Amino acid sequence: MQFKHFKLATLAAALAFSANSFADITVYNGQHKEAATAVAKAFEQETGIKVTLNSGKSEQLAGQLKEEGDKTPADVFYTEQTATFADLSEAGLLAPISEQTIQQTAQKGVPLAPKKDWIALSGRSRVVVYDHTKLSEKDMEKSVLDYATPKWKGKIGYVSTSGAFLEQVVALSKMKGDKVALNWLKGLKENGKLYAKNSVALQAVENGEVPAALINNYYWYNLAKEKGVENLKSRLYFVRHQDPGALVSYSGAAVLKASKNQAEAQKFVDFLASKKGQEALVAARAEYPLRADVVSPFNLEPYEKLEAPVVSATTAQDKEHAIKLIEEAGLK
């Protein structure tokens, strides 16, 4: 009897050791905190691996990772803009992601890492939010380029400091050329109203300060969920037909090559791309899941109906060039 109890105690100890044999991981998080917290909790429940989130702005965290190099305490970089991977990849700071994991979110138009060292996880669409008590869909332009004209002077808000805006400038430059991109930026400066954040621009439309603004879709969906669509003045307009104004930008994750917990870090990225991970993410924030078997509870415009332009993954050079155009236009 004592021998049987000894065997049971030994088995229990072994199982306890097995359950806790994974190391904790640290994630440098530039994704919106509620989304990152939701997926981190879901991952902890699924695996028992504890996740510590070090949250901040994606660009600042990417710069910190470059400074820290192989001494970084980070295991994973989770960002709201895949463009921030460009410098890190070029510097050789990212570890390869398995092809099996990458293929889980590989849809038409979704950027793929040239070195297969990061993965896109969710999308957000550029949209025009407008005050439906002052404007209707027939007043909306067919191209985002037309909002930077005297017709819209004092009537269009924009946020030049957001990562999605930078991505839109990159797309404009690639699709239409530098001259068109620069003229658009100068037109916005001349005719538009500058706001510090997308949420502030949205609220300006709600408050009647400006009749329309260029923002990301999820800000409106989150506000609609909170207050009810019937209580909002604002509505969304989707530009579509592969116009730069229909751009979809993507969040993503990468494993740091310097991570001492490679297995756990890779497991976390695998989870983010899995059905359970995607469900946790899109339940917390109105972003587009990149898996066909996951549906957002926010009643989003169907991903395939966005008609977003297909633009190659942003490189470090693309980013630098877009920043120069923004600066040349006097927006920074």
Curated annotation (Swiss-Prot):
Secretion signal span: 1-23
Effect of residue 37 to V: In strain: PAK12085 and SB33
Residues the entry annotates as binding Fe cation: 32, 80, 218-219
Induction field: By iron deprivation.
GO cellular component: periplasmic space
Any one GO molecular-function label of the UniProt entry: metal ion binding
Effect noted on mutating residue 119 to V: In strain: TN106
Pfam families from the UniProt entry: SBP_bac_1
Domain of life: Bacteria
SUPFAM superfamilies (UniProt xref): Periplasmic binding protein-like II (SSF53850)
Biological role stated in the UniProt entry: Part of the ABC transporter complex FbpABC (TC 3.A.1.10.1) involved in Fe(3+) ions import. This protein specifically binds Fe(3+) and is involved in its transmembrane transport.
Assembly information from the UniProt record: The complex is composed of two ATP-binding proteins (FbpC), two transmembrane proteins (FbpB) and a solute-binding protein (FbpA).
Annotated family: Belongs to the bacterial solute-binding protein 1 family.
Protein name in UniProt: Iron-utilization periplasmic protein
Gene: fbpA
